Amino acid sequence: YKRQIMGSTTDEPHAKKITDKLDEYNITWEQHAASAHKQPLKVLEILENNKNNNDIIYITIAGRSNALSGFVAANSQFPTIGCPPFSDKADMLVNIHSTLQMPSSTPVLTVIDPGNCALAVKRIFGV
C-alpha cells in the first residue's frame, strides 16, 4: 500500500505516470496534495494518520525547491521515494540537488523516471 504526496495539484500529470504503472502492478495507492513549504501541518496530518499502518511507501513529487521529500522522510518511519517532475533537462540540472542532498537521518531514495519509481515500489513490496 502506498501513499503519494504531491507538493501541488500542478504535479498531477507527473503523478499519473506513476499511478498508471502502479495500477498495472495491482498496487493500491492513495494520493494527496500538500506543500511542505506552504502546508506543513497538512503534510504532518497525512503522516500522522498513517503512522500505525503497515506496508507503506511514500512517493513524494515536488519540483523546484523540494522540501517535501526530506520533510516526509524526517517525520515518518516509512521509506520515502522522491520522484521530482522536471520541465526539461535544464530544470533538472538546476533543481535535482534539492531532492538528492538531505541532512543526516533523512533517507530519501531518488528515482527520476516515473515508471522506474513505480517499479521500485513493486520490487520493495516483492510483488
Residue spans of the language-model regions?
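Conserved small/polar residues in nucleotide/adenosyl-binding loops
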Residues: Y1
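Short beta-strand segments
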Residues: I5-M6, T60-A62, G82-P84, L109-D113
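C-terminal binding/interaction regions
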Residues: M6-P13, K17, E30-H32, D91-V127
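Short, well-ordered secondary-structure micro-motifs
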Residues: A15-K16, L41-E45, S69-A73, L93-V94, ...
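Short helix-loop-beta junction
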Residues: T19-W29
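Short beta->alpha junction loops
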Residues: E30-K42
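Glycine-rich phosphate-binding loop
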Residues: E45-P84
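Long, charge-patterned amphipathic alpha-helical coiled-coil/hairpin "stalk" segments used as oligomerization
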Residues: L68-T106
